[in-house]
UniProtKB/Swiss-Prot annotation:
Its main location: virion. The lineage of its organism: Viruses, Riboviria, Orthornavirae, Kitrinoviricota, Alsuviricetes. The N-terminal arginine-rich stretch does not seem to be the major RNA-binding region that allows formation of an infectious ribonucleoprotein complex. This is Capsid protein. Signal peptide: none annotated.
Length: 218
């Protein structure tokens, strides 16, 4: 064997482990990509049902119907004594109520517990007669009659309870924006007093699209 053949054979011997190393590395990279894709799909699946503190609250839950948008309002209940009630009518901004004949399809309520939340609350939305003063007795009767769904939200060690949303469908009622003043959000504090720094309610009213201004405010 001459010198050139000896040198070539030596190179071939040195290359073999490198080829094996590349093969093992490629296999490892492929496995990592598959695992990453599986984790990504799992995270998307979990996120679909996971409550979020992002506002507006249709994000991460229900999509608006075609041709519809929504208006959000935020309610912060006052202190509610143990076993007592609170009610607040839905008051939309004037820029929305001027289109009072636009249909409303759904109302969504999301309960956002603040860090000090350690209570159990019941939340619902009801059509309330204009003559009602939303007294404790009146609200108590509305919770008891079973005429609308009720969301029960209670303290969880994680700080967030999975079922923090209530969706109220008004499609069959042909309700419009002008009717919203007839609806109220009702809260019952079951186990102890609900303090003012424990809870925030986000209410989304899904309605037909309305014209928006193209001029900046003065």
């Amino acid at each position: 064997m001459d010198k050139s053949e000896s040198t070539s054979a030596g190179r071939n011997r040195r290359r073999r482990p490198r080829r094996g190393s590349r093969s093992a590395s490629s296999s490892s990279d492929a496995n990592f990509r598959v695992l990453s894709q599986q984790l990504s799909r799992l995270n998307k699946t979990l996120a679909a049902g996971r409550p979020t503190i992002n506002h507006p609250t249709f994000v991460g839950s229900e999509r608006c119907k075609p041709g519809y948008t929504f208006t959000s309002i935020t309610l912060k209940p006052p202190k509610i004594d143990r076993g007592s009630y609170y009610g607040k009518r839905l008051l939309l901004p004037d820029s929305v109520t001027e289109y009072d004949k636009k249909l409303v399809s759904r109302i969504q309520i999301r309960v956002n517990p603040l860090p000090k939340f350690d209570s159990t609350v019941w939340v619902t939305v009801r059509k309330v007669p204009a003559s009602s003063d939303l007294s404790v007795a009146a609200i108590s009767a509305m919770f008891a009659d079973g005429a609308s769904p009720v969301l029960v939200h209670q303290y969880a060690a994680s700080g967030v309870q999975a079922n923090n949303k209530l969706l109220y469908d008004l499609s069959a009622m042909r309700a419009d924006i002008g009717d919203m003043r007839k609806y109220a959000v009702l809260v019952y504090s079951k186990d102890d007093a609900l303090e003012t720094d424990e809870l925030v309610l986000h209410v989304d009213v899904e309605h037909q699209r309305i014209p928006t201004s193209g001029v900046l405010p003065v």
